Amino acid sequence: VAIVGDLSEDGKIEVIGIGSHPSRGLKKGVVVNIESTVHSIKRAIEEAELMAGCDIHSVHTGIAGSHVRSLNSHGIVAIRDKEVSSSDVDRVIDAARAVAIPADQKILHILPQEFLIDNQEGIHEPIGMSGVRLEAKVHMVTGAESAAQNIVKCIQRCGLEVDDIVLDQLASSYSVLTHDEKELGVCIVDIGGGTTDLAVFLGGAIQHMAVIPIAG
């Protein structure tokens, strides 16, 4: 499925084109036949371009499959100048991502859950706040390097550039979940053609995700 969106003045995305074609070259979210996948992508893109009345040159693509993994991590740094800056946030995120992952996996997302300043919990926007110690709790999502490369290769063979690779259920959450739902607690379940993707949100952030290689 290919979807074309137009960004409105108020920051909302309006869908102006949709294209679809059976995904013959994918099995349970993973490319198993490059030629068939390329053909399916081309057909879906052509339909979306025709409906939207524009040419597509780059895309954001979703990723799923049983190869996707996730874990919670955290990092701690000293706050420079006693006031949190964007540099401090970057450093603490880097500290949180410094965990060992299998050699065949790559990091897809580092999703902040909350920040703590001098043990004060529940902070989501720490920049400008005072303190001496900054801690970040994050949810890290990884996927097989080869699976991601094959998706990118198929898209590039269609003459398109890949702007970003996004976890399927994370992309779904942007379109169907409200801020209040994520804050109070919600589980999104996306039953697709090859996988069933789920994600649990609480406190405004993702807490857990899973991919089940069984679908509709």
Where are the model-predicted features located?
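Nucleotide/phosphate-binding catalytic cleft detector across ATP-hydrolyzing
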Residues: 3-189, 205-209, 216
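A generic beta-sheet turn/junction motif
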Residues: 191-193
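Active-site proximal loops enriched in glycine and acidic residues that flank catalytic Cys/His/Asp
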Residues: 200-202, 210-211
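Short beta-strand scaffold segments in enzyme catalytic cores
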Residues: 1-5, 196-200
